[in-house]
């Protein structure tokens, strides 16, 4: 069985080689499974694509994609999914925090009959800022896009081929990958995995990038529209009540200057 591993790469010229090599070694321990890699360089500022080309020359099962500018992690993954041909598709990071040694747990869980499995980190090695932003993202996906109850999403996942086939039909730019997963299937599970510390460098997610990602959630929900409708209804009702109050006051107090009541009604 072929397993495609899609990795978005950004400024990872040193870690991507080790990530691929450790994954290759891990698959040697899994009889009946083969792997292919789709490495997507998201316009890195270092020699990441040179490392990808070197890996392509070393391994015939490695595909390299070089994006013309920085499109962001989710768009980079989508680009890679278009070239993934496996029966299962795994998404993971390039920094070894989503460690290849945990892949057998993902495969074992999806073999139980699930369409999509997210790795759930029992204890994370993230810093305070990353933990905070992850909690915000969880809140948004739960309350705005109806994430299945009890499911913890992460960047380490495995899905069936039909899930990939459905997702790649989405052609818009501002995408939030997890939402597309939730729209495709509800047969989702978690499996607890170990989260490893970053071996070098720091997270490439700035607050600006995270904010843009969160705002992309608005493309998939009617919650803002419902809130705007509710607010509009409240304002309209308040205006009617105010106009009635002004009209009644005018009737009870004819001495109010001419034009005041009509002006107040217009303002309400």
Explain the meaning of each model-derived region:
Residues 12-28:
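Short, well-formed alpha-helical segments that are part of the catalytic scaffolds
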Residues 31-43, 65-66:
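Short beta-strand/loop segment that forms part of the nucleotide-sugar
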Residues 41-50, 96-97:
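A conserved acidic beta->alpha catalytic loop
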Residues 14-18, 46-55:
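Acidic helix N-cap motif at the loop->helix transition within catalytic regions
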Residues 176-268:
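Hydrophobic helical membrane-anchoring modules
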């Amino acid at each position: 069985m072929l397993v495609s591993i899609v990795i978005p790469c950004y400024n990872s010229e040193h870690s991507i080689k080790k990530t691929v090599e450790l994954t290759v070694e891990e698959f040697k321990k899994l009889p009946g499974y083969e792997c292919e890699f789709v490495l997507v360089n998201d316009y890195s500022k270092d020699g990441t694509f040179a490392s990808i080309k070197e890996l392509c020359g070393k391994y015939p099962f490695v595909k390299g994609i070089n994006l013309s500018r920085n499109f962001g992690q989710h768009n980079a993954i989508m680009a890679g999914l278009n070239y993934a041909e496996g029966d299962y598709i795994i998404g993971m990071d390039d920094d070894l925090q989503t460690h290849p040694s945990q892949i057998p747990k993902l495969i074992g869980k999806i073999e139980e009959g699930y369409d999509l499995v997210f790795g759930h980190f029992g204890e994370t090695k993230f810093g305070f800022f990353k933990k905070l932003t992850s909690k915000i993202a969880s809140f948004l996906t739960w309350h705005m896009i109806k994430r299945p109850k009890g499911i913890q999403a992460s960047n380490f996942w495995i899905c069936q081929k039909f899930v990939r086939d459905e997702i790649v039909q989405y052609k818009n730019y501002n995408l939030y990958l997890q939402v597309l997963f939730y729209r495709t299937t509800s047969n989702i599970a978690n499996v607890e995995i170990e989260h490893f510390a970053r071996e070098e460098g720091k997270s490439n997610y700035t607050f600006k990038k995270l904010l843009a990602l969160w705002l992309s959630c608005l493309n998939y929900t009617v919650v803002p529209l419902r809130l705007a409708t509710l607010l509009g209804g409240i304002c309209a009702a308040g205006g009617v009540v105010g106009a009635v109050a002004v009209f009644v006051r005018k009737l009870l107090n004819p001495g109010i200057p001419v034009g005041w009541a009509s002006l107040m009604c217009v303002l309400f």
